[in-house]
Design a protein with these regions (language model features):
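Catalytic-core helical/loop segments in enzymes performing group transfer/polymerization on anionic/lipid-linked
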Residues: 1-411
């Protein structure tokens, strides 16, 4: 895989080697650091800045383990409550026996659905309508973004049922045995990660990885494993053949989902859709060659244009439709560009949001600054560190871009 920065390439290759060893224990496929994701473990930032990783004390380790158990068990209980609420809601998808299906694996943003009172396709606009026009049976297999409160999910289930959205959720098909397996994962995962940590040695890269893994040790880990169980349970349903079109960011949850689908006895095709403008600095976006042997990579990957293609053994990488960017071409012809604002577009990683807000507050900007938070973020959580002369906007990016003199973001 080619990166413009040779240090990123070196870090990518190092993590590739370590993840290949780690994934022999399937529980570690759920670890986001080993998936090369951006995390608060700050492996990427620490390595590129040549910083010395902070030492890990016994107190920190004990604290991380306790917080891990508390956070994961509370989240697991909320997940079980959500499953009960799903049963109460009556939301259900009926699979036609022996019929081929297209499964749309994409994010469902909870706040957006509740605020709008309906589900609006944001990642594959136009695709559901196309499938319906062609009389192709399809169903969503959603990745929930922003799930914390089961009561909010209950509202979502009712909205989906009322609007007759074809959604097949994990809450419908996971069994008691699956929930017991999740509980087992919660208790065994720390031991798997600890065994891997003990094998790390004294190189600078090992120290950076060691610190990153411990800093994220207390994250909620079981959700990625639940995607594996969900996909595996999907394969027991009476589908004909399955074609899965997946919004593909190569996250730990994606890898687990594909691994589960590969247990299907009939024909399964997985298409990973990278139909977005990707930054070269996000390592997880680029599939790892060594992941293929673990069944963690799609059969085909669609990218946003010829400039985004890359070589990957035994996996086709082709140009797909830029479904989300139609407005850019339309606006370029129909709208004038005023250049009246500085537009700051923030990511969905908390530590980077805080860092960017700190940087931009020290600059004397020549024009009014408007801050656009990621749709999944609650901007009010950052109200105290947003400069008073800056404005937070909820306008769409389509309306903001023609007004921007400069756009500031993270990459």
């Amino acid at each position: 895989m080619k990166f413009k920065n040779p240090k990123i390439k070196k870090l990518y290759d190092y993590l590739s080697l370590k993840s290949k060893k780690a994934y022999r224990d399937h529980l570690l496929i759920s670890n986001p650091v080993l998936s090369k994701q951006e995390t608060r473990g700050r492996v990427f930032e620490t390595y590129l800045a040549d910083k010395t990783p902070l030492p890990t004390s016994f107190y920190l380790i004990a604290k991380k383990i306790i917080v891990y158990l508390v956070k994961n068990l509370i989240s697991f209980v909320l997940c079980i409550i959500a499953a009960l609420f799903h049963l109460i809601s009556g939301q259900k998808f009926h699979v036609k026996d022996g019929v081929d299906y297209v499964l749309l694996d994409t994010f469902f943003k909870i706040d957006h659905i509740i605020n709008e009172g309906k589900f609006k396709e944001a990642y594959f606009p136009g695709l559901p309508e196309y499938l319906s026009d062609k009389n192709i049976d399809y169903a969503y297999v959603p990745k929930w973004f922003g799930f914390k409160n089961p009561l909010r999910l209950l509202r979502i289930f009712k909205i989906l049922r009322k609007n007759q959205v074809p959604v097949l959720t994990q809450f419908q098909i996971l069994t008691l045995a699956d929930y017991l397996e999740i509980a087992r994962f919660i208790f065994l995962y720390p031991f798997s990660l600890s065994r891997f940590l003990r094998k790390l040695e004294s190189s600078y890269e090992d120290k950076v990885l060691f610190g990153g893994l411990w800093n994220t040790f207390d994250d909620v880990a079981y959700e990625s494993h639940m995607r594996y169980l969900f996909a595996k349970r999907l394969t027991t349903m009476k589908f004909g053949n399955i074609k899965c079109i997946s919004w593909y960011e190569n996250l730990a949850a994606d890898k687990n989902f594909y691994r589960g689908l590969r247990t299907f006895s009939r024909k399964t095709e997985i298409i990973g859709a990278q139909l977005y403008v990707r930054p070269d600095t996000l390592m997880n976006i680029f599939p790892d060659q060594s992941d293929i042997s673990f069944d963690l990579v799609p059969d085909k990957i669609l990218v946003n244009g010829p400039g985004f293609c890359y070589d990957l053994d035994s996996v086709k990488v082709e140009v797909g439709p830029a479904l989300r960017y139609k407005h850019l071409f339309k606006d370029a012809q129909e709208e004038s560009f005023s250049g009246e604002i500085i537009l700051v577009v923030l990511p969905y990683w908390d530590h980077l949001v805080c860092e960017i807000l700190g940087i931009i507050s020290d600059i004397d900007w020549p024009k009014p600054v408007k801050i656009k938070f990621h749709p999944t973020m609650n901007w009010e959580s950052y109200e105290q560190i947003i400069p008073k002369n800056f404005t937070v906007t909820i306008e769409s990016i389509q309306k903001l871009l023609p007004r921007a003199f400069m756009v500031v973001g993270s990459s």
